[in-house]
Curated annotation (Swiss-Prot):
This is NADPH-dependent 7-cyano-7-deazaguanine reductase. It is an enzyme of class 1 (oxidoreductase). Belongs to the GTP cyclohydrolase I family. QueF type 2 subfamily. One of its GO terms (biological process) is queuosine biosynthetic process. It comes from Haemophilus influenzae (strain PittGG).
Length: 279
């Protein structure tokens, strides 16, 4: 996997940047999904058939035609089959460029964002712009399943190691939903920590919870984007556990007014966006 690709070298992430005072769609920067999928051997055929990068954008503002500031929160679904993912700092800079620009109404802003994101991602993107009142009524949710974090085990290594999943299943066939709040990886470019809650829903041979937890913890010093981590977890579970059905879903904490929540499945529909306690 060659992370020195020119598409990474040109990213604004980790560089000192200035904030645009007027709307500028050219601030958006794509990252080819193939950069990570080539290494996983899934560029042409992905083992998941349903998926999206689900973003929540909390810091959106623009001016109405009379110059009065408006604010909103956006739910954004970026299809897993898009050619590119969107680099998060460039997305933040792009959203900030709306701050001093005039738009006629919510719909004009929503349509503008959707058009620009589709062009950058080279794939399907859905944008829903919400008034703040919608989120005032939103409850803090939790992901349903058995939490695997309270095991009395000793951890001595924090280097990524997929081999923790070797021989991880028994002969018992089950349907399980498992949750871990201990997912932590690091940004591919800046090395900043990314904190997430991981949800795994599968049907197949029962996965050993200790081996799974050790595997999750091994991401602690691993450098990849959120979306790439989730696809790696999906591929590793398919390789070692070989479930009949599998969903991998991670909800990461907010940074720069954005949270990113990748969802990949071979049997479940996309979830409604929600908000966890750490979000």
């Amino acid at each position: 996997m060659n992370y020195q690709d020119n598409s990474l070298k040109s990213l604004k992430l980790g560089q000192k940047t200035e904030y645009a005072s007027q709307y500028d769609r050219t601030l958006l920067q794509p990252v080819p999904r193939a950069l990570n999928r080539d290494g996983l051997g899934i560029t042409q055929n992905q083992p998941f058939t349903i998926g999206a990068d689900i973003w929540t954008a909390y810091e959106i503002s623009w001016l109405n035609e009379k110059g009065l500031p408006q604010v909103a929160i956006a739910d954004i679904y970026l299809d897993y089959q898009s050619q590119n993912l969107i680099e998060s700092k460039s997305f933040k800079l792009y959203l900030n460029s709306f701050n001093q620009s005039k738009f006629t109404d919510f719909n004009a802003v929503q349509q503008t964002m959707q058009r620009d994101l589709i062009e950058c991602a080279q794939g399907d993107v859905k944008v829903r712009l919400n008034p703040v009142a919608v989120y005032d009524a939103q409850k803090i949710e939790h992901l349903q399943g058995d939490c695997i974090d309270e095991q009395d085990i000793e951890i001595t290594s924090y280097e990524f190691n997929a081999n923790w999943l070797k021989d991880c299943v028994s002969d018992e066939i089950v349907e399980e939903k498992l949750v871990s709040h201990l997912l932590k990886s690091n940004c591919l470019i800046t090395n900043q920590p990314d904190w997430g809650t991981l949800h795994i829903h599968y049907v197949g041979k029962k996965i050993n919870h200790e081996k799974l937890l050790r595997y999750v913890v091994s991401f602690r010093q691993h450098n990849e984007f959120h979306e790439q981590c989730v696809e790696r977890i999906f591929c590793d579970l398919m390789h070692y556990a070989k479930p009949e059905k599998l969903t991998v879903y991670a909800r990461y904490t907010r940074r720069g007014g954005l949270d990113i929540n990748p969802f990949r499945s071979n049997f479940e529909n996309l979830p409604e966006n929600l908000r966890l306690a750490r979000q």
